[in-house]
Amino acid sequence: MANERQSFALVPHDWHSTDYVAEWIVRDAARDAERRPLLRQMLSLAPFPRDAELDVLDVGAGYGVVSEEALRAFSAARITLQDYSQPMLAQARQRLADHSDRLRYILCDLTDPSWPQQVGGPFDLAVSAIALHNLRDPEKIFSCYRAIHDLLRPGGYFVNCDRFVEGIAPHLAELRESGFARVECPWQVPPRAIVVASRAVG
C-alpha cells in the first residue's frame, strides 16, 4: 500500500501534450478488461430506467471511456463531457463520433470556480471514474463535490469510482456535508472504491 500511495503522488502528467496523452491512452487501454466491468457496475447503481432521457455530466471525462459505457447503459442519455485537457477531449470526439448529436464537450478546469457555470445543467446524473484524485488536494476534490451536488436536479445521482488513497471515510463525510441526502460506498478494494450519492428529492 505504501508503494502504491507513493506512486500515485509522484506520477507527473502532461495532459496538455498531444503526444503524452496518446501514449498514456495506449497504456490505459491495456487495463480495459479489468476496468470495464467496474464501470458497468458503477453505472448500474444509478437507479434510472435504461431508456430514460437523462442529462448526464461526465466529470473529468478524459478520452470518453465512462461516457461510452454510459451511452450503452442509458440509450437515450445526453452527455456533457468535461475535461481540462484538449488532447483528451479530441480523443473522446473521435471515440464517440457516432453519438455526436447527443454529446457536448466542455474544456474547463475543475479548480476554476466558474466551471459549474461553464458546464451548464442541471443534470440528472453525474459520473466520474479515476479522475478526481488527479486534483491531488482534498479540499479541491471536496469543492467539486459541492459543485456537483448543486448541478444535480432534485433526486439526481452522483456515482464515482476513484482512488481514495487517504481512505474513503473523509470523502463520505464531505459528500454528506455537501448536501447529499444519501451517501453509500457499495464496493471498495482499497485504495479504489465506488461511491453513490443522491440529492434530496425536495
Model-predicted regions and their roles:
Residues 55-57, 63-113:
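Class I SAM-dependent methyltransferase SAM/SAH-binding core
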